Design a protein with these regions (language model features):
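Domain-scale detector for complete catalytic domains at protein termini or as standalone homologs
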Residues: 3-75
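Short beta->alpha connector loops
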Residues: 8-14, 87, 135-139, 205-206
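Conserved N-proximal alpha/beta basic substrate-recognition cap immediately N-terminal to
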Residues: 41, 49-136, 384
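Conserved ATP-binding module of the ATP-grasp superfamily
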Residues: 128-130, 151-154, 169-206, 239-242, ...
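Short beta-strand-to-turn element immediately C-terminal to the catalytic PLP-Schiff-base lysine
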Residues: 135, 165-170, 215-217, 281
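Acidic/histidine-enriched active-site and ligand-binding environments that engage anionic O-linkages
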Residues: 145-154, 223
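ATP-dependent carboxylate/phosphate-activation module, predominantly the ATP-grasp catalytic core
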Residues: 196, 203-269, 273, 280, ...
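Peripheral (often C-terminal) accessory segments that flank ATP-dependent C-N-forming ligase machineries
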Residues: 317-414
Length: 414
């Protein structure tokens, strides 16, 4: 098959975008064989006209990126390699580098995919961030947190979607937290044997959280967006809402942009999209949480499109295939998403969907739970049940619209 675009990892949402942007049979999906079977990738990919085929390769073997280069033959007319999942970032950079195409760059991709490597890099680059260390046991976590008054953050170095991330207060048991973090798994998303099995313990900072999305072309920031975040209170910091634009004071936005530019320059990140999360200590001083070298999840790309106009996916393709650099302006409206959750138990009834869809500014309402669905604890992004996406004249108005519409949806469990 002679595809023009290669995707490292299966992403239903990205393929839906590419159906609108690319000709039929132009995309090759590269996925790990185990993950492809678990996620029914062949059948699901066949539902997208843009897909030419699916090939199996060690796309998640980040310790041996040369393996993906040996396993995947270069399509004759390939124009771009796209990291379509978090676990495909290193593979995409490796293929793009080997094939002479624009991309993150192998060295930058390796740093972004390892939270410990990113922490070490941020220290050397002078980027503000929490104090941290690698932890190999509950005892090491206990020693670290004791020096900080007992509060800390515990997380895996190479997972996504807040999986295994725990916020500890002084009274929380270290052994229980260590077990929860070290046993957190994504059996359908992560290939066996590919996780490094390493963990971080970090200083727990306080302040609002935001993410910064940057479109980067040959090391230059073409576009920067700041997304406001709402996190669920409690030990599991699951994101339950986003809003674009965040509506921060201009000096804070300027400082975030300056720090993103330093991150790009210091890592050598070349071309693509960055999605970095920051805590604003005292509401004004950004401290780095983490950074991904791919499109943002949680429909943030859709929020950016609705607020700013244009298509961020089309812009990504432009910088990855050396097209004319896209031009974007400031946000012209607001867009927000609110995620739907429920108490653990079996779903007995669902109501309010019609009213929610008819609410002010609502663009989309999705709910996966049905009568009889078993709802578990809300420990990661994978445990959310759906979302409401809304727009408004400003980010604040969009956030109010999304929250009001989400409040109309009731999922009763027992």
């Amino acid at each position: 098959m002679d595809a023009t675009h290669v995707l490292c990892g299966f992403s239903k949402g990205l393929l839906a975008d590419l159906d609108d942007l690319l000709p039929p049979a132009s995309v090759l999906v590269v996925e790990d064989e185990y993950v492809a079977a678990q996620r029914d990738v062949h059948r699901r990919s066949a539902q997208h006209p843009c897909v030419a085929g699916v090939v199996h390769a060690p796309v998640q073997d980040e310790r041996n990126p040369a393996g993906i280069v040996r396993a995947v033959s270069r399509p004759e007319h390939v124009r771009a390699v796209v990291p379509s999942t978090e676990y495909g970032v290193v593979a995409a950079a490796a293929l793009a580098g080997a094939w002479g195409l624009p991309g993150a760059g192998p060295a930058a991709a390796a740093v972004l995919r390892d939270k410990a490597a990113l922490r070490a890099h941020a220290d050397s680059a002078g980027l503000p961030q929490p104090r941290w260390r690698l932890a190999g046991s509950a005892a090491e976590v206990e020693d670290f947190r004791a020096a900080l008054g007992g509060r800390c953050v515990l997380k895996p170095v190479d997972r996504q979607a807040s999986l295994g991330v725990l916020l500890l207060d002084a009274e929380d048991d270290t052994d229980t937290a260590w077990k929860a973090t070290t046993t957190a798994e994504e059996p359908r998303m992560r290939a066996p044997g590919t996780s490094s099995g390493r963990f971080l313990v970090e200083e727990r900072l306080t302040g609002p959280e935001v993410s910064v999305e940057c479109l980067v072309h040959r090391g230059d920031l073409l576009f920067t967006n700041v997304t406001g975040k709402q996190l669920r209170p409690g030990p599991y910091p699951v994101e339950i809402g986003h809003v674009v634009p965040a509506g921060l004071p201009a000096p804070v936005t300027g400082e975030l942009t300056r720090l993103m530019r330093r991150l790009v320059e210091s890592t050598g990140f070349s071309s693509g999209v960055l999605h970095a999360e920051w805590i604003l200590v005292d509401g004004t001083r950004p401290h780095l949480v983490e950074c991904a070298g791919r499109l943002p999840g949680d429909s943030i790309d859709t929020l950016i499109d609705l607020a700013h106009g244009g298509r961020i996916v089309a812009d990504l393709l432009a910088v990855l295939q050396e097209g004319p650099p896209p031009v974007r302006g400031p946000a012209r409206a607001g867009a927000a998403i609110r995620f739907l959750t429920a108490r653990p138990g079996m779903v007995r009834a669902v109501s309010g969907l019609t009213a929610s869809r008819e609410s002010n500014g609502v663009r989309e309402v999705e709910l996966t739970a049905r009568q009889g669905t078993v709802v578990g604890e809300l420990n990661s992004s994978w445990d959310r049940l759906g979302h409401v996406l809304a727009t408004g004249a400003t980010g604040a108005e969009a956030a109010r619209n999304a929250a009001a519409a989400a409040a109309l949806v009731e999922v009763r469990t027992s």
